[in-house]
Amino acid sequence: MRDALDSVINSTLKEWECVIVNDGSQDETLSIAKEYEQKDNRFLVVDIPNGGLANARNVGIRNSHGKYILPLDSDDKIGEKYLEYAVNYLETHSETKLVYCLCHFFGDINGFRKLPDYSYQTILWQNVFFPACVYRRSDYDKTTGYNPNMKHGHEDWDFWLSLLSPNDKVYRIPDVQFYYRKHGVSMIDGTIKRLSETNRQLVLNHLDVYTPFLGDMIEWHNELLHYKGSYLALLKSPTYKLGHVLLSPLKWIRNIFSK
């Protein structure tokens, strides 16, 4: 948490406020937050019962007074110039709805995080943003906020679908200004069933967005079944079985020399 708060303090843009939401945490989070609040009046601590990440984001934003919003999770960091770059761009490009940047992993995994290029069609099927994008408070107020029914993750992806429309412009700063701490297991990691339920809830929250693609989805499903059937038929074919037999001696030799 200190890394996150220190990264805000070190920002080259000095006119900011940081609302720290303690979402029912019973560890040292609240004491650390109050420590920063006492030494810098740009910090504000809001202590609430545990209500989930989406609710915490909404509480933080609704207790803020700034023109722009940047949600920052407690274990991530921003670069020194991220706020400056993002705010300056939004100030001079009124047609742009959201600004983000290049991203670097740190923690259990270190390295550049390659994100797919943004298009509205792409974000319907996969999340192309990290949580800490910058957008206008006035645009947030036109939505219902982050949806608390996204209980097992994807709350940010769900919000981007509420925030963005097909013709909205998005800008990516061509510089690494966000550092995403990678843990061994994230909130969205878990069973296939839970992930499936989360994806289903995402679609249900945005039926108006996904309904026009229903015909395409049925066609894709049928194509997938066709390819699956072709693959299973290949596995049972004499040609495949013969190839497997012919390769067996080579695999045996490889295993000997690999010991």
Language-model-detected regions and their locations in the chain:
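Short aromatic/hydrophobic "clamp" motif used to bind/position activated sugar donors
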Residues: I69
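Glycine-rich, basic loop-to-helix element that forms the pyrophosphate-binding segment
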Residues: A4, I48-S64
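Short, acidic, metal-binding catalytic loop of nucleotide-sugar glycosyltransferases
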Residues: D6-E15
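Conserved donor NDP-sugar-binding/catalytic core segment of glycosyltransferases
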Residues: K81-F112
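A conserved acidic beta->alpha catalytic loop
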Residues: N22-S31, N50, D73
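Acidic helix N-cap motif at the loop->helix transition within catalytic regions
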Residues: M1-R2, D27-E35, K77, K81
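Boundary detector for helix-to-coil junctions that initiate low-complexity/charged tails
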Residues: E197-K259
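Conserved nucleotide-sugar donor-binding catalytic segment
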Residues: Y118-T198
